[in-house]
Amino acid sequence: MQPWQCLRRFALAWWERTAEGRARSPREEVGPRDPGGRGEPDPERSSPPMLSADDAEYPREYRTLGGGGSGGSGGRRFSNVGLVHTSERRHTVIAAQSLEALSGLQKADADRKRDAFMDHLKSKYPQHALALRGQQDRMREQQPNYWSFKTRSSRHTQGAQPGLADQAAKLSYASAESLETMSEAELPLGFSRMNRFRQSLPLSRSASQTKLRSPGVLFLQFGEETRRVHITHEVSSLDTLHALIAHMFPQKLTMGMLKSPNTAILIKDEARNVFYELEDVRDIQDRSIIKIYRKEPLYAAFPGSHLTNGDLRREMVYASRESSPTRRLNNLSPASHLASSSPPPGLPSGLPSGLPSGSPSRSRLSYAGGRPPSYAGSPVHHAAERLGGAPTSQGVSPSPSAILERRDVKPDEDLAGKAGGMVLVKGEGLYADPYGLLHEGRLSLAAAAGDPFAYPGAGGLYKRGSVRSLSTYSAAALQSDLEDSLYKAGAGGPLYGDGYGFRLPPSSPQKLADVSAPSGGPPPPHSPYSGPPSRGSPVRQSFRKDSGSSSVFAESPGGKARSTGASTAGAPPSELFPGPGERSLVGFGPPVPAKDTETRERMEAMEKQIASLTGLVQSALLRGSEPETPSEKIEGSNGAATPSAPVCGSGSRSSGATPVSGPPPPAVSSTPAGQPTAVSRLQMQMHLRGLQNSASDLRGQLQQLRKLQLQNQESVRALLKRTEAELSMRVSEAARRQEDPLQRQRTLVEEERLRYLNDEELITQQLNDLEKSVEKIQRDVAHNHRLVPGPELEEKALVLKQLGETLTELKAHFPGLQSKMRVVLRVEVEAVKFLKEEPQRLDGLLKRCRVVTDTLAQIRRQVDEGVWPPPNNLLNQSPKKVAAETDFSKGLDFEIPPPSPPLNLHELSGPAEGTPLTPKSGNPTKGLDAPSKRNMDKAVSVEAAERDWEEKRAALTQYSAKDINRLLEETQAELLKAIPDLDCASKTHPGPTPTPDHKPPKAPHGQKAAPRTEPSGRRGSDELTVPRYRTEKPSKSPPPPPPRRSFPSSHGLTTTRTGEVVVTSKKDSVFIKKAESEELEIQKPQVKLRRAVSEVVRPASTPPIMASAIKDEDDEERIIAELESGGGSVPPMKVVTPGASRLKAAQGPAGSPDKGKHGKQRTEYMRIQAQQQVRVGYQAPRPLEGCTPRLCYMPLS
């Protein structure tokens, strides 16, 4: 290739890049004009424009999002959502004229610079002056085509995406909200142009259009700073935007810096989360994020230059998709029309044939590593300075694989710095920004063909797209891609003469050919005139920054782990230095014969694919899995390893880099050095299949990890919900407890009591102090005879008076507190009583159940046997049963009433005389009146019990001090001890033993005679009234409540003519047991009976025992009626019930106040009866014909 061709291409590229920034407004003139010409401003928007400037934007129409626009054209990529504007273009004549003048000036300026550059080239290379002049003429002729090519073709193809515009606008607003907290600009709403020579701003603009299309708020980012700008009028051209940026960053940016090719203005596409180069100011809308990216002039000549003040963040270059959907159609157009065939024969390898002639497309194609699209392309800015000295670099051109690769893979950073093959040592990147070479993305390391530290022309720059994702490759697609489209090798031509003109530096120092090639042989591999390098060489491999910092000399443990996965194909040392007629292994040499081309192509394709897969697989799974060992490092000196240390089956990533293992190496043949290694297609397919299996396994593991993460999230979410529900329940319960009236009343009473106690404590303390002082004064007077001063005594008297007044107030306050506390404590008192009485009640119920069980078993046995015991057997069993039942009834509360019907009473003769008893049968018809009397007496007993309970309730609610104190003492005693001992009452009050002499011989009125027979005649006059109530009970008048319960056992005892006490019974001992159980049940504590009766009045209390109580009362009334019908000549005596007497003796003090007198009588009488019971004897007399057996109690001598 001739040097003048190189210079021509340099000149063309330089002129295009220089004129690109200047001529954006003029090129927009190419857009179609609206037929309407100018319109009238809206009357309601008549305020003058803030800025007067010309408008160079495209004519456009706003359409509704529903798609009501005019045709398919006019649809913006980002429209202001909700605007419906179909007005035509409104430009004034001044704006149009200014636009034409501006475009003319810029064209003239560009032509002048181009001519100056061409003259410089002619003077420096006079031998190529003619060719350069022809090139200059052709460039002038091609100028209109250039501008027509720069037209936004996508404006006519994307008119049917209003929904996307809506989504993008919403996303832009949402993401810009996160920048609200950043630093605001210290400036008014607008800015003014102070330089009168600036003629690039829009001159005239109608107020309606400027306000309608004003973006509102813009976020400008430069380096680490972010400024928010409020704009009331439209940014109508790039010059306006440049002026705004220069005004916002006055100390850092100027208009000249913004217009230089080293500065890029990027705008964020919220829909795809990617920054792309701003080419049309109509893309700016409300809350847009604009980033200014600038390179230092010192490094501007190198595409991968150093970044200092520009902070190129990850979202600028890590595009998840292409830059914008409206510009995908012209992605390939700048490069493909010039690179559609192989490079010209004379083109040097340092210049890519596919150099774009237009502005770089804003796609992943043009992303040269971490640089914005403006810098994709070859380093041509200072070509004149380089052409004379060092050979041209290999050039940087977009990777052809960027078209097919996935867009969700981050692009690699470009290792192109001061030296093309500069070695990266321990994470020291050439980019200053944190998202440079050592970010998470894969790193593409370029190696120099010659001296790695020479000028970039020696080794050149290699830029690659990101590694293709595993999911986008299949074995067949890879094979067809490699064999059909990428490799077009000829017998003597370059190996990769494809349309992209891709150039690669050598993959490793071992594969460098000797610089001094033999005479007659092809030029050295690094020569600018050598053929194009192998595209599949291992230098295209990449590795991730695996742990802390990756480096070339010492790779991280993640990189070491790759040695187990795959290896890049290498060559024995004999092949590293090819002879005159041979080609180096990786294509850095003269063309090779075509016989082994297919084999080498496959090997290199495998190297490329294995490197890509290794970087993904090992960084995902084996990060830091194996420790770093010194044996795995290969130190390089000046970027080159010793040729005598070949690594079979592994190709180094760059000069001095640690070799990255690939698939198992092919068998190295023992043939001479010139013979290549043969790899069969079967081995290739096996390797590809293994790679596919590995990729599928990795996908499965990734799916499992995702499922596990989702499960963990669900479990955490469920736990949070459960905890939240529990907390809310507890909070609501606490709030409900606070709202409870009883709880609130208790809290208030407790607070009042604490205040009362505090006051009382204070008074007590003051009184103690006063007493001590008075005692001291008294001691002083007594011992020292000291005269007490009068003021001191007056002071003590005053303190005493104050204490007395305070104490009086406290005492007056106590009754109210007492009443409140009684109301609150009533619930506790009732609860304590319940705790005391409930065990007794349950035991009584259980005993009754046992008695019923015994009775039923006895009846069943008699029915089954069909034999009824004779009466004398019953009489023989009676005394034992009576004695047993008497002992058993001491703790008995309830008994079952007798099932047998009432029988007539008969006398039994005393056992001392031995004479038979004279039966005195009563009138049978009187027994028939018993049911009616029993019903009346039942009603009377219920009424009496109700009155008793009401009196007790009234006494409880009146809260007399005596009752409350007694109740509280009772409660305290009941809490301290368990159920009181019921046997203690009969032992504590012994009485005189009754004798028969005390009994009168006759008792004409049976029940009245019993009290007079009490020994010692104590309280005889008082006890006369008690049996009187008993005799009046059958009458209609209701008696007072206590007497019937006070003497329940006043019937059934008679005396014979000799004065002996005889107990008459209607049946066997079961009846006596029944009577005793009746008396015991009636003699239960008063609270129980009251509670049982009060159930009729107050249903909220303990469940009643009314059935058994009423049944027992019915039996009792029946007995009384039969006693009266038996005749008045039989003087009865009480049936002694020691258990009942003990209960009454124990319960006597706890009786109600209105029955105190009768309670004392009852207690005294029961004590006497208890003494009688000790001396009672039993006898079974002879039965008489036609009479039921009787039981006789005889007094002991």
Swiss-Prot record:
Residue spans of biased composition, Low complexity class: 332-341, 348-366
Top-level taxonomic group: Eukaryota
Biased composition (Pro residues): 520-531, 1036-1045
InterPro entries: AIP3-like_C, SRCIN1
Modified residues (Phosphotyrosine): 276, 431
Residues with the Phosphothreonine modification: 86, 658, 671, 918
Keyword Disulfide bond set for record: no
Keyword rRNA-binding annotated: no
Residues recorded as bearing Omega-N-methylarginine in the entry: 364, 371, 535
UniProt GO molecular function: protein domain specific binding; protein kinase binding
Post-translational modification: Tyrosine-phosphorylated in response to EGF and to cell adhesion to integrin ligands.
Endpoints of the signal sequence: none
Ranges in a coiled coil: 688-708, 760-780
Family classification: Belongs to the SRCIN1 family.
Subunit structure: Interacts with BCAR1/p130Cas through its C-terminal domain and with CSK, CTTN and SRC. Also interacts with MAPRE3/EB3, SORBS3/vinexin and the N-terminal coiled-coil region of SNAP25.
Protein name in UniProt: SRC kinase signaling inhibitor 1
Organism: Rattus norvegicus
